[in-house]
């Protein structure tokens, strides 16, 4: 199959070609490091009825994959583990990356992060400087990947977007609906309580000034200005409290991958 039009965040093998078997992510690979994929060289094996069948080894389970009639594709699917293995070099400016869950992804050469689209994985993969691993060179152990983002479910539209802050209780703008929401509920709750408290204090001060300076205000009309300022500050604080109390909250889909 051609990989030129494949989305960078989707698996290279779509569900329409995978039959009724859905690839799963083995839990024991969670600490593995993503690696760049080079197409392994395919070889020919002899069989009694043919002169030679081109085959390659699966990069996941090492089973033999028959390439007969598939040499025009960029990747092929293993019939044993249902994972993809590249047989051609990626398009210009692209590279293959295999997620620790064994999902084969394609992304730009300059990409630093990529998200795994599998529902049971959803890792945020920090590519960094990726070393190309040839078929003859065994994979070297790598340091654990430091999390640099998390997936957040928008409180307005319900879509998931990548939030690169390492702390919650901040405001975020959804790239899908372009609306502002709070990542976590602690920030709007604290600010709502703070504005309600300040607003009520200003209102009480304004009422006290109004009652206590009735006679004084008849002689000095500038006293009305202090009344107006106190009432206005209290009203502004209460309006801000209503804003923070009604703001939508977006929650992280799960902890850091």
Curated annotation (Swiss-Prot):
The chain crosses the membrane at residues 192-212, 227-247. Residues 13-23 have a biased composition (Polar residues). The modification Phosphothreonine is found at residue 22. Its EC number is 3.1.3.78. It is a multi-pass membrane protein. Keywords: Cell membrane, Cytoplasmic vesicle, Endosome, Hydrolase, Lipid metabolism, Lysosome, Membrane, Phosphoprotein, Transmembrane, Transmembrane helix. GO terms for molecular function: phosphatidylinositol-4,5-bisphosphate 4-phosphatase activity. GO terms for cellular component: late endosome membrane; lysosomal membrane; phagocytic vesicle membrane; plasma membrane. It comes from the Eukaryota. GO terms for biological process: negative regulation of phagocytosis; phosphatidylinositol dephosphorylation. It catalyses: a 1,2-diacyl-sn-glycero-3-phospho-(1D-myo-inositol-4,5-bisphosphate) + H2O = a 1,2-diacyl-sn-glycero-3-phospho-(1D-myo-inositol-5-phosphate) + phosphate. A motif (CX5R motif) lies at residues 107-113. It is found in: Late endosome membrane; Lysosome membrane; Cell membrane; Cytoplasmic vesicle, Phagosome membrane. Residues 1-10 have a biased composition (Basic and acidic residues). The active site is at residue 107. The modification Phosphoserine is found at residue 33. Residues 1-43 are annotated as: Disordered. PANTHER family: PHOSPHATIDYLINOSITOL-4,5-BISPHOSPHATE 4-PHOSPHATASE, TYPE 2 PHOSPHATIDYLINOSITOL 4,5-BISPHOSPHATE 4-PHOSPHATASE. Catalyzes the hydrolysis of phosphatidylinositol-4,5-bisphosphate (PtdIns-4,5-P2) to phosphatidylinositol-4-phosphate (PtdIns-4-P). Does not hydrolyze phosphatidylinositol 3,4,5-trisphosphate, phosphatidylinositol 3,4-bisphosphate, inositol 3,5-bisphosphate, inositol 3,4-bisphosphate, phosphatidylinositol 5-monophosphate, phosphatidylinositol 4-monophosphate and phosphatidylinositol 3-monophosphate. Negatively regulates the phagocytosis of large particles by reducing phagosomal phosphatidylinositol 4,5-bisphosphate accumulation during cup formation. This is Type 2 phosphatidylinositol 4,5-bisphosphate 4-phosphatase.
């Amino acid at each position: 199959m051609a990989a030129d039009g494949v989305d960078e965040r989707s698996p290279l093998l779509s569900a329409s070609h995978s039959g009724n078997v859905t690839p799963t992510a083995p839990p024991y690979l969670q600490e593995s490091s993503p690696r760049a994929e080079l197409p392994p060289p395919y070889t020919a094996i002899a069989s009694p009825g043919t002169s030679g069948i081109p085959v390659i080894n699966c990069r996941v389970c090492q089973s033999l994959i028959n390439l007969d009639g598939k040499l025009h594709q960029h990747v092929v699917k293993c019939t044993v583990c249902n994972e993809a293995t590249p047989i051609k070099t990626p398009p210009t400016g692209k590279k293959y990356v295999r997620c620790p869950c064994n999902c084969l992804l394609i992304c730009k050469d300059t990409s630093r992060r990529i998200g795994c689209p599998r529902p049971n994985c959803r890792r945020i993969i920090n590519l960094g400087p990726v070393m190309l691993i040839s078929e003859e060179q065994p994979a070297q152990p790598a340091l654990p990947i430091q999390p640099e983002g998390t997936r957040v479910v928008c409180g307005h539209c319900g879509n998931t977007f990548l939030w690169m802050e390492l702390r919650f209780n901040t405001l975020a703008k959804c790239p899908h609906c372009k609306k502002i929401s709070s990542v976590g509920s602690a920030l709007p709750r604290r600010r709502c309580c703070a504005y309600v408290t300040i607003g009520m204090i200003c209102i009480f001060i304004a009422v006290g000034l109004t009652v206590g300076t009735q006679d004084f205000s008849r002689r000095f009309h500038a006293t009305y200005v202090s009344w107006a300022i106190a009432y206005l500050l209290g009203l502004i604080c209460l309006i801000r409290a209503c804003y923070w109390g009604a703001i939508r909250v977006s929650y992280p889909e799960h902890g850091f991958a």
